[in-house]
């Protein structure tokens, strides 16, 4: 900015009272500007109206407004004044201190500004020099490139900061959501436990009433028996004193008197089983997931297995294959490729709308003879619209609340438990308890419909989180 114009602006920013740059400028009703502190001194010393120091217009104390725009302009002019002073100081150093000549050259080797006489001296003899304007233009471009690089780096850092900030917000939202979800789950567990508590109390009360009713009936029977026996005893004692013939005629009544059978009192056993969604089923799925695939060597000839050995379906056409003792021939079934003889394993099977299916495990010597399912075979299956059955030591029919289209199977070999879960509502379907002593192989009965049966694969968990 031109120095004359700057001087005019500086004069505009001078306070009429203190003759210095205005501090915290305020504007009176007459339109003149003053320092707030200066104007306050006036109304502290005077009573009544204040007269403007410039135009002598009267106005009451505190009847002014702060001029923020004028304050910003004053600060800007101060900054320009400082810059102008700095530029003047720099211009004062453009003359060579040795020879009092203008500095017009730049020594590339020594990176120093020189006058003409300095460039001819022995100190800079043979050095490449160029005009200051040319050197400054080149170095300005270098600096501009460096500035652009720095700006780009700053922009990248700012973008990363923004991303991290969004992640922090996301983590906070996720943590808040998890808190809400935990509160909801705890509330559901409390409701479930309260419902189970009331149901078990009611069932126990009904069992108590039933037992007391049976016991009272038994006591009445005993009392009747005792009364009859006492009456007969009196009669026999009376006959005992009579003749032999009379005694013998009454004897058969004693033989016909039978004591009632003892009444066995048994209380019902109660147990509480938490639903799968509250008993760590999600952790079981993540931590103990087994890579189960179908074994082609054991598959029935009419079963078609996918390339990844995760899907299988029944085909009507009978293919020409070589007979194998390992294959199932009587019905469309097959085993898994890998057997289990230790540890805990989980796999999940999609049965969809198949009308018939059976899932479970069997021992290697399992012959597939349906008449001998109590040995080496533990499974559940569907054989009709609403008919489900367990195969094993005990054949039991059951009816799920929700029809399962996906079944989760969890084997705890050491504990001797094989559990089946309905993954549609995450409820427990059935649990076998046994002492396993040999290798167990996943078993699959497909049925004769065309719909496929599929082994599902869940994403592999991050083991570092456990």
Curated annotation (Swiss-Prot):
Superkingdom of the source? Eukaryota
Which GO biological process entries does UniProt record here?
A: negative regulation of non-canonical NF-kappaB signal transduction
Q: Name one GO molecular function term.
A: SUMO-ubiquitin ligase activity
The consequence of inactivating this gene is: TRIM60-deficient mice show an elevated immune response to LPS-induced septic shock and L.monocytogenes infection.
Kindly list the ranges of residues that form RING-type zinc fingers according to the record: 15-56
**Known CDD domains for this protein?**
RING-HC_TRIM77_C-IV, SPRY_PRY_TRIM60
**Xref: Gene3D superfamilies:** 2.60.120.920, Classic Zinc Finger (3.30.160.60), Zinc/RING finger domain, C3HC4 (zinc finger) (3.30.40.10)
Write down the InterPro entries for this protein, in alphabetical order: B30.2/SPRY (IPR001870), B30.2/SPRY_sf (IPR043136), Butyrophylin_SPRY (IPR003879), ConA-like_dom_sf (IPR013320), PRY (IPR006574), SPRY/PRY_TRIM60 (IPR035786), SPRY_dom (IPR003877), TRIM/RBCC (IPR050143)
- Domain B30.2/SPRY positions: 272-462
Q: What keywords are assigned to this protein?
A: Coiled coil, Metal-binding, Zinc, Zinc-finger
- What residue intervals correspond to the zinc fingers (B box-type)? 91-132
| Binding-site residues, Zn(2+) | 96, 99, 118, 124
SUPFAM superfamilies cross-referenced by the UniProt entry: B-box zinc-binding domain, Concanavalin A-like lectins/glucanases, RING/U-box
Q: What does the record list as coiled-coil region(s)?
A: 171-223
What the protein does comes down to: E3 SUMO-protein ligase that mediates SUMOylation of TAB2 leading to inhibition of NF-kappa-B and MAPK pathways by suppressing the TRAF6/TAB2/TAK1 complex.
What does the sequence similarity comment in the record state about its family? Answer: Belongs to the TRIM/RBCC family.
| Protein name as catalogued | E3 SUMO-protein ligase TRIM60
Q: Which gene encodes it?
A: Trim60
